[in-house]
């Protein structure tokens, strides 16, 4: 027969291939699929594979000019989700050639670009991605990574302490710098611009940069410790963002900050390259993540956004707090914390990790615990996150009845007490409150903080 068979086609004939052996170079994806009533799971899984790779809704003449077998995504396994009716995990393998090297932007446009609006699906969630080593090697990754950061800061054997300056909107640059100085002087390692502090009428970015730099050099001179303030370089255009980053470098500060989801992966990767070339650390905030990751059956899990950030580049990223949440969430959070920090992470479904991930020596990212935490949480945080983390107390520092500096002192004393207790072999989970109480006998600042935030 001449020509080809026209017409709308069944996806599963071409894109559902249960005998496919995945290649080491494939990008693997685990999707949680909720098909519309009457759509078989194989067809739904195949539709996802097709729509996110070579497929289109009908047979086209130009299909004859290419090798589908070489370029198509394949749904190679489907399993029902325990405890949910009509939900399936569809595993899809994508050939590496479908993706541009070193572009998180292109990876996401391909894998999650179009398929989420697909009619045959009621909902779709990307749960995990396996990034093959061949693709990982096309990315620079974090500007410096955990070890280099410790060496730059000369801080070892403990988590780092931070604080977001509040009220986040409305302070003048001079008063903002003053708040930064008080916190750093009191014993914090870092202070942070809030994610929505960019360059507003009440405080233009250059004024803030200047006063914050002054504050941190003064605190550095007085304490003999290296200090940092995350200067938020996020801006409306990439050019403006780079201008801010360059200004930070000229001031000689150690670290800048970026909102990677609202700023976009292209901007973030550009900034990460600049940071490595110019010796700046890069702190990443995840504003907008809940828009993408909060629904259990639709969107993308945060572990995917975290992996994407490690490829794109950042030295710190916000990762939730775990404290006071459900146990299950603790395991899941620790799963993606390991994916950020470790070089090799084994598949472990109980921790939400669908694929073994080998990062082939890509530098690690330090997770940042932030949001609603205070001194009584310190033992749990030290135990859960370990040394390679930043613990960020905004209200938990600035809410201290005696002011910012005593608030900073309280947090530092609590942290040092927890680290010492851990190193002496005490059980932080069981004796946490006792450890904090003992320490507060020697520190009136900590005692006052313990009073304000009673567990």
Swiss-Prot record:
Carrying N6-carboxylysine, the residues are 192
Q: What class of enzyme is it?
A: lyase
- Report keywords, A-Z: Calvin cycle, Carbon dioxide fixation, Chloroplast, Disulfide bond, Lyase, Magnesium, Metal-binding, Methylation, Monooxygenase, Oxidoreductase, Photorespiration, Photosynthesis, Plastid
Q: Which reaction does it catalyse?
A: 2 (2R)-3-phosphoglycerate + 2 H(+) = D-ribulose 1,5-bisphosphate + CO2 + H2O; D-ribulose 1,5-bisphosphate + O2 = 2-phosphoglycolate + (2R)-3-phosphoglycerate + 2 H(+)
Gene Ontology molecular function: any one: ribulose-bisphosphate carboxylase activity
Q: Which PROSITE patterns match?
A: RUBISCO_LARGE
Q: Which InterPro entries match?
A: RuBisCO, RuBisCo_large_chain_AS, RuBisCO_lsu_C, RuBisCO_lsu_C_sf, RuBisCO_lsu_fd_N, RuBisCO_lsu_N_sf, RuBisCO_lsuI
The residues the record assigns to binding substrate are 114, 164, 168, 286, 318, 370
Post-translational modification note: The disulfide bond which can form in the large chain dimeric partners within the hexadecamer appears to be associated with oxidative stress and protein turnover.
What's a single GO BP term from this record?
Answer: photorespiration
Q: Which residues are marked as site: Transition state stabilizer?
A: 325
Q: List-wise, which residues carry N6,N6,N6-trimethyllysine?
A: 5
> Can you quote a single GO CC term?
chloroplast
Q: Which residues form the active site?
A: 166 (proton acceptor), 285 (proton acceptor)
Tell me which SUPFAM superfamilies the record gives: RuBisCo, C-terminal domain, RuBisCO, large subunit, small (N-terminal) domain
- The entry's Mg(2+)-binding residues are 192, 194-195
The answer, when asked if Plastid is one of the entry's keywords, is: yes
User: Chief location of this protein?
Assistant: plastid
What's the Enzyme Commission number for this chain?
Answer: 4.1.1.39
| Biological role | RuBisCO catalyzes two reactions: the carboxylation of D-ribulose 1,5-bisphosphate, the primary event in carbon dioxide fixation, as well as the oxidative fragmentation of the pentose substrate in the photorespiration process. Both reactions occur simultaneously and in competition at the same active site.
Relate the assembly described in the record.
Answer: Heterohexadecamer of 8 large chains and 8 small chains; disulfide-linked. The disulfide link is formed within the large subunit homodimers.
Indicate the family of this protein.
Answer: Belongs to the RuBisCO large chain family. Type I subfamily.
Q: Misc remark for this entry? A: The basic functional RuBisCO is composed of a large chain homodimer in a 'head-to-tail' conformation. In form I RuBisCO this homodimer is arranged in a barrel-like tetramer with the small subunits forming a tetrameric 'cap' on each end of the 'barrel'.
Which HAMAP family has this protein been placed in? RuBisCO_L_type1
Full protein name? Ribulose bisphosphate carboxylase large chain
Organism listed in the record:
Vachellia farnesiana (Sweet acacia)
- In the record, what lineage is assigned to the organism producing the protein? Eukaryota, Viridiplantae, Streptophyta, Embryophyta, Tracheophyta
């Amino acid at each position: 027969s001449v020509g080809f068979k026209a017409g709308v086609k069944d996806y599963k004939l071409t894109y559902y291939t249960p005998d496919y052996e995945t290649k080491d170079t494939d990008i693997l994806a685990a999707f949680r699929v909720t098909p519309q009533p009457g759509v078989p799971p194989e067809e739904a899984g195949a539709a996802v594979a097709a729509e996110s790779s070579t497929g289109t809704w009908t047979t086209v003449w130009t299909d004859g000019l290419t090798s589908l077998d070489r370029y198509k995504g394949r749904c190679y396994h489907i399993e029902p989700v325990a405890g949910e009716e009509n939900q399936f995990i569809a595993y899809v393998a994508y050939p590496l050639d479908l993706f541009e090297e070193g572009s998180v932007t292109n990876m996401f446009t391909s894998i999650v670009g179009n398929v989420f609006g697909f009619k045959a699906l009621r909902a779709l969630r990307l749960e995990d991605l396996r990034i093959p080593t061949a693709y990982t090697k096309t990315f620079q990754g974090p500007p410096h990574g955990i070890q280099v950061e410790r060496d730059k800061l000369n801080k070892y054997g403990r988590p780092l302490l931070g604080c977001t300056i509040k009220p986040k909107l409305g302070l003048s640059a001079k008063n903002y710098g003053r708040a930064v100085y008080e916190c750093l002087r009191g014993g914090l390692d870092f202070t942070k611009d809030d994610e929505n502090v960019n360059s507003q009428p009440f405080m233009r970015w250059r004024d803030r940069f200047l006063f914050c730099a002054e504050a941190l050099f003064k605190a550095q001179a007085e304490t003999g410790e290296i200090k940092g303030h995350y200067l938020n370089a996020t801006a409306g255009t990439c050019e403006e963002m780079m201008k801010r980053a360059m200004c930070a470098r000229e001031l000689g500060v150690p670290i800048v900050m970026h909102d990677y989801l609202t700023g976009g992966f292209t901007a973030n990767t550009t900034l990460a390259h600049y940071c490595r070339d110019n010796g700046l650390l890069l702190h990443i905030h995840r504003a907008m993540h809940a828009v993408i990751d909060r629904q259990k059956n639709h969107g993308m899990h945060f572990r995917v956004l975290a992996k994407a950030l490690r490829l794109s580049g950042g030295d710190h990223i916000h990762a939730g707090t775990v404290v006071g949440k459900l146990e299950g969430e603790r395991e899941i959070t620790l799963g993606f914390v390991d994916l950020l920090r470790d070089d090799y992470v084994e598949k472990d479904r109980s921790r939400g990790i669908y694929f073994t991930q080998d990062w082939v020596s890509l530098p690690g990212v330090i997770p940042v615990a932030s949001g609603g935490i205070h001194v009584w949480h310190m033992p749990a945080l030290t135990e859960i996150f370990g040394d390679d983390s930043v613990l960020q107390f905004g209200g938990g520092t600035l809410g201290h009845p005696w002011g910012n500096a005593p608030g900073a002192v309280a947090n530092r004393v609590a942290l040092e007490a927890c680290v010492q207790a851990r190193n002496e072999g005490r059980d932080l989970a069981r004796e946490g409150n006792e450890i904090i109480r003992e320490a507060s006998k020697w520190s009136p600042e900590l005692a006052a903080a313990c009073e304000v935030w009673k567990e």
